[in-house]
Amino acid sequence: MLGYTGTYKGKRLSVQGTGMGIPSFSIYATELIKEYQVKTLVRVGTCGAMQKEVEIGDVVLAQAASTDSSLIRNIFGPAIAFAPTADFTLLYTAYNQAVNTGLKVRAGNIISVDRFYDEEIDNDKLTDFGILAVDMETAALYTLAARYKARGLALLTVSDHLITGEHADADTRQTGFNDMIKTALETVTSLEGMP
């Protein structure tokens, strides 16, 4: 998996591919934190919308991430349902950055799932409980950030809609992803003293 280190507006930062899903993401995130002392992790990726008002191309800031993965149960056991959440400073800064640049942004809860094609999951119930979108990594990001006292945030561009069946075309993907990545870069570099 490729990773790069460079500068943005004079500030040093790294970009790292993490693969797909919680197991792959967990390996890369853990090694970044433990081996390289990374203290701020921002995931940029895609998600599938689960609310009618969330549209293709919208940016979703994951405030918290439920999961069907055994990740949390393996750490806490069956008695505790740990709620993995974003770092508030990152979330607040990214939200304001997105709004100020005219992006259509939504902040709220998502779900990170283990299977891309999952016919058993009750999407209607998740929608009724206000879940905005689905991805496959954010719960791991927030859980590992909490475990290792790092900061975590996921910015996700809606590429597919689970309710309407819509999919982003190539132009929407390119433009939307660029806007999301710029928001992430501006967020990280705007915070003074953030490692």
Map each language-model feature to its residues:
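Short glycine-aspartate micro-motif
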Residues: 39-43, 133-135, 152
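Active-site rim beta-loop-alpha module in soluble metabolic enzymes
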Residues: 80-129
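Zn-dependent metallopeptidase/amidohydrolase metal-coordination segment
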Residues: 139-173
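Short glycine/serine/threonine-rich phosphate/pyrophosphate-binding segments
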Residues: 23-26, 136-141
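His/Asp/Glu-rich mid-to-C-terminal helical/loop segments that flank catalytic regions of hydrolases
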Residues: 162-195
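Generic non-transmembrane alpha-helical segments
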Residues: 93-101, 144, 183-194
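Metabolite-binding pocket within alpha/beta catalytic cores that recognizes anionic/polar moieties
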Residues: 1-84, 88-92
